[in-house]
Amino acid sequence: MATTSHNKPSLFPLLSLLCFISIFLLLSLSKRASLSSPKTHRSATVFPPKPDGSLSPLSATCDFSEGSWIYDPNPRSTRYTSSCKEIFKGWNCIRNNKTNGFEISNWRWKPKHCDLPSFDPLKFLQSHRNTNIGFVGDSLNRNMFVSLFCMLKSVTGELKKWRPAGADRGFTFSQYNLTIAYHRTNLLARYGRWSANAKGGELESLGFKEGYRVDVDIPDSSWAKASSFHDILILNTGHWWWAPSKFDPVKSPMLFFEGGRPILPPIPPATGLDRVLNNMVNFVEKTKRPGGIIFFRTQSPRHFEGGDWDQGGTCQRLQPLLPGKVEEFFSVGNNGTNVEVRLVNQHLYNSLKSRSAFHVLDITRMSEYRADAHPAAAGGKNHDDCMHWCLPGLTDTWNDLFVATLHTIKAL
């Protein structure tokens, strides 16, 4: 009996190994989840299988926001050229002789589990007849608007300038009666200069002499009618909320009002952003057209190195960042020059919880890699432009994402 018991293999080492493997896998999954950006309201799209039941590259759930940039040394013909007249001079990196101006568009975004196709501008025009599309936000939304315009303009010459109420730019593609417009608004909410009243007041009693009045419950006049006019709306805000050159916290602070009265005690910009987002989201939900499709675009990243724009910061890279470098640039824990992008997104995601009327266009992750795609010194300013994007360039991919998501929404 003793001999038999000694010959039996012990199960303890095997059980120990299985426990170790299980713990390792759990820790690995936990770490992966902690490094990824929020999944809520992502640009995740469900595509049906092919008629024969086989899986296509777009089958199953596709999270377009996670992937990598693949260099194509022999890309297909460009979708539009640097001669598109709507391109703002400072963004025309090819004409401005930026070193990698031609190569910027050679990089293709490849999501992890599917493909993001380049949209067909002619098919888009044909399938969106009698449609109004509005971009509402700061100059980064104009960047995206110009990209879409140039791609559509490349396949049709029938065009007329026409601006809806409040719009800064607008065009109608006559043959298709499709209008696209850009409504400029930095904060979404109405704001303007504020100066102390000689007769005194609530803010004056606290020592405020001047600043900027921000009415958190009133949309800026540039887009107040946009949600009831456009069939498709793409909104953004973020960059101007932490702009000390404009809203100096001491010399010209943001002073928030609601219901026509100052919010007391005064609140910081981060809290003001939350108030504005909640109010503007409510406004759009109440005023949008029946069947209207509303997107909120996530924050576009900046890529300043060596300081901010007014501190000698530059962006001279000629290739996309590697994943590890992306975290150095943008991790909230590092609190670096460019951390604004993820901070703004936290506010955005919080404001859109349980908001079924909104679709989030998550361009942040794919854009965080593209430190090479800004105008930089070729922007013609007295400092590197590491905030806007070259055209042709990255915002063309934003529009691919926009169109792919739009088609899926309409197919549901």
Swiss-Prot record:
It comes from the Eukaryota. It is a single-pass type II membrane protein. A motif (GDS motif) lies at residues 137-139. The chain crosses the membrane at residues 9-29. A motif (DCXHWCLPGXXDXWN motif) lies at residues 385-399. GO terms for molecular function: O-acetyltransferase activity. Belongs to the PC-esterase family. TBL subfamily. This is Protein trichome birefringence-like 13. It comes from Arabidopsis thaliana.
